[in-house]
Amino acid sequence: MAPISHTRISLSMYNSWIRYFCRTGETNEAMSLLAEIHSLGSRPDPLSYVSFIETLASLRRTLEADALFHEVVRFMIYGSYSVRLYNALVSRYLRKEVSWRVVNEMKKRKFRLNSFVYGKIIRIYRDNGMWKKALGIVEEIREIGLPMDVEIYNSVIDTFGKYGELDEELQVLEKLQRSSDSRPNIRTWNSLIRWHCHHGAVDMALELFTMIFEDIGELVGKLKSQGVAPSANLFCTLANAYAQQGLCKQTVKVLKMMENEGIEPNLIMLNVLINAFGTAGKHMEALSIYHHIKETVWIHPDVVTYSTLMKAFTRAKKYEMVCSFYLVTL
């Protein structure tokens, strides 16, 4: 881009260029314009500050974002963007003490905390081992009459799941399903299934799977209508859960659903399928997946592939094949 001539540029033009550079990620150019505005004894407008802080925060340049934030607070440059300004800061800070400082500043200035901020607070508590305090936030939300949206429910579900409180996690799911304001979304199911698998409650994970996939066509249709498609991560988690139980048909079904969504099975997924067949005692089917991997140009067997095959053929007492796979790994 050609350099900007700064002679006789109006303040509104400065603001327009700052916002443009923020949108395009050219923060150094925006910083130069900010410095020039300051040298002229003026300041950007509220929207320019918000755009600047959002951009810096998204790039994890939190010290610079914090400095601009304090400038905004000091000179009361809020406009109509005060909540958006605070949300940008809260969403990007990784350290709980800094996030809390921003939240407390919001409370001090009588800004109404929204569900986004409360969800962030719950996650701060969760990530620092204070899950009971995280649940106390839910009571605060109820007391002020803020509707419990799906993001708050998801934060609570993820908190219970992380600390193995699976019964409580399911109770929150029931409340969400009964809610007139919110419904479970793909993040809800991802979290429920992932934590149940993580804590060894595979049967319940499979039950949750059937709850969302009773009518796969209807589910996918709903997700797409909301602009959300089932993720590769969800399919992988479900396939692995079935594979651990040796449920081959279900594992294959999940992989086919994934292919129907245009997600190509990768080596991890195919290793999962080998494991499913091996656990079910179908070593020849496991071998056919191995041959498929070998024939695929962009995928190559790894140590997991061979170790899984060795387990499958050990179960089948085909020890000569176990030796042959072992030799390949040397």
UniProtKB/Swiss-Prot annotation:
Keyword check for Repeat: yes
Residue windows of the PPR repeats: 10-44, 45-75, 83-113, 114-148, 149-179, 185-215, 231-265, 266-296, 302-330
Gene3D superfamilies for this protein: Tetratricopeptide repeat domain (1.25.40.10)
Protein name from the UniProt record: Putative pentatricopeptide repeat-containing protein At5g36300
Keyword match Transport: no
Transmembrane stretches, start-end: none
Pfam families in the record: PPR, PPR_3
Organism superkingdom: Eukaryota
Family membership: Belongs to the PPR family. P subfamily.
Organism: Arabidopsis thaliana
UniProt entry keywords in alphabetical sequence: Repeat
UniProt xrefs under NCBIfam families: PPR
Entry-linked PANTHER family: OS06G0710800 PROTEIN, TETRATRICOPEPTIDE REPEAT (TPR)-LIKE SUPERFAMILY PROTEIN-RELATED
